[in-house]
């Protein structure tokens, strides 16, 4: 109706020759056509104007902004400056709002320059828009600079800067701003408090979020639905069910139940705290279920691997007139992949196509990531290849997962290729990709590359710090790891339980007993983190390996958690190193109850008994293994030469170049003996002569792989070998000699430890 009326009026103006007579008339016409007819026609009217004043220029810029054509709007704004026309404050504020996305950041900086040239920095609305524009582009220091330059600040100014801090993760600084704001005589409103609640929620800091809520209530403000939703997000993690239920009670008492967003967030909270029955109850009680509510429950059921229930819910969903979207299907596909059923997950992709829902990069990444979580890396890589065949380009999440997989497989060469891809596609700026690169290089035995990437990250997340600390731990670089942790604390980053696992691993792998105790106590006293089994295992391993077996025993007896197989395994390993049979047999008995089929425990006892020449006990353990049908883990090592991975097995399949390898190895050992090498025959757990033991030592897979690397890898390229079990002390010694005699760096990886040999020394300083 209004469109027809507008066209009629404009037609009448044209008939009377008044359509171009007054710029106010033309400007109004441009506004009408831009809103109701066609942006192109509005621009045509502007182009045909014989004379343009400030009103016309500002109107055409606003017309393009309202229509979403921000690039044209910015172009017109530049032309406007050359014409001498003056931009209205409202036009520039709107332009700055549009330039808040990353694509428009450069234009936003130019508009800021225009503001400064015209002396408009006293305009509060303009400055508020500048604060928001800079913060949304991650430029917090520039946001603060604008805020500090403001002579007059209103409540919106304070909310803008406070929101900048919370959205970029600096919530504690935002609390400081809140205090400063109150000192200046301004009373925080609901927007202020919701910004703080949202900031704490995004970091999962439930206690801090609740403290803010209490402070808000003391100030006389009642929480809004947005406040409650943020609070629910903050407690949406395992262990916080009690808090979540308390908030649910508050919602009921204060009649906030009617809000769909609150109800949906409640469902999500119950799912993430692991209480699906309550999530279903909330869902069933909803009067109006939107697509988000359905997707939340389907996602929760899929995550819990209740896939039949998830599919049944999707059928019910369609019956109630809501069509499953890509998010719904992606949840189901991820569930099947996580359950170890990639074929079923790919079937979901087929069903999506049948239903007219186009699978996207998120769909494929969901399956890819699901296989990865399940530890099924081979299937994950197959899915990635299939994704490429379908013509779906990977995004940052895909590449992060791929890098994680390559790190777990120690495929450094492939990891470098993916790194190159990320550079070409400009994905390296993504925080998750950068962190995944640090993780991949650390786990693949290239610590230097991990360090270079890590220190190049501008806004380091807690996850990136944790990855870097674990990298130092893997290499036994204790002093550097502790120094990095100190820098992290100085930067204001608050450590979590994972951080302390990394820090204690740094201490454990470097034999730093005093530092280990210091950080274990600090974790509890300053940060209120309750020690987990992982933390306790690190302490037992640290104390035991350092020779403090009695202290390790006392620690086990007094720890608040019940010792599990991880604890007793670490203790048994320490007893084996220091040949303490009495304590070893106590640990062994506990392990027989906890994990009677773990071959590693049997092998540690065989190792200890053989070193004490108790051959009858060795045979007794071997018989026990046979009776319990415990199979010794296959032993192998591998090395990549060019594009080919060469695997060396302890038994069974031989390498085609075995003759050349043994010839070179015997030659090397002869040279080593002249330099002082004495074979450590205690690594062979058989009652045979030393000469026979020495021959068996030559067949250790890591030695064959290292020797093959020396033969095939010319120049000074490092020799990188991965072994699936712990290396023996003799192989460790041989690697040190090889690094000197052949002037080569050798990187030998065994599980979560990496030994970097250079000039006859190892990065672990023989603490392993």
Swiss-Prot record:
An example Gene Ontology CC term for this record: mitochondrion
UniProt-annotated stretches for the region Type E(+) motif: 643-673
Intervals holding PPR repeats: 22-52, 53-87, 88-122, 123-153, 154-188, 189-223, 224-254, 259-289, 290-324, 325-359, 360-394, 395-429, 430-460, 461-495, 496-526, 532-562
Transit peptide: 1-25
Chain segments annotated as coiled-coil in the UniProt record: none
Keyword Mitochondrion listed: yes
Protein name: Pentatricopeptide repeat-containing protein At4g01030, mitochondrial
